[in-house]
Amino acid sequence: MSTTFETTPAQITALMSRPTDAPVVMVNLLKFKQDGGWERYLQYGEEVAPHLERVGATIRYGGTAPANIIGDGERPWWDAILIVEYPTPAAFIDMVTSESYAAVHKHRAAALDRGDLIATSTWSIGD
């Protein structure tokens, strides 16, 4: 289980090795801090919106995770899922490495007990 909220150089290198002309869809699994985590994350959401817009990212889904239907346990470890599509891996990296984003990122880090970020690729059933 990772509790860090920073990417490593190896993770950035792996992301940059993906196709440069294909979107990357980031799946965020979010566990909020008990005391004010949800509120801090909403603040992050408001402040990150212009950064997402600047790089052409689109929020595809956001919602809570109240129960498992298939899987271990009655409830997943995360409280919410957020799915954001970036036009390219470079767009994501451009956003998260900008100085202006660093001021916003502090709210995300303060809001979460855990926040896994999984880089995925899209595919169709016929692929």
Segments predicted by a language model, with ranges:
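Core nucleotidyl-transferase/polymerase catalytic module
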Residues: D113-L117
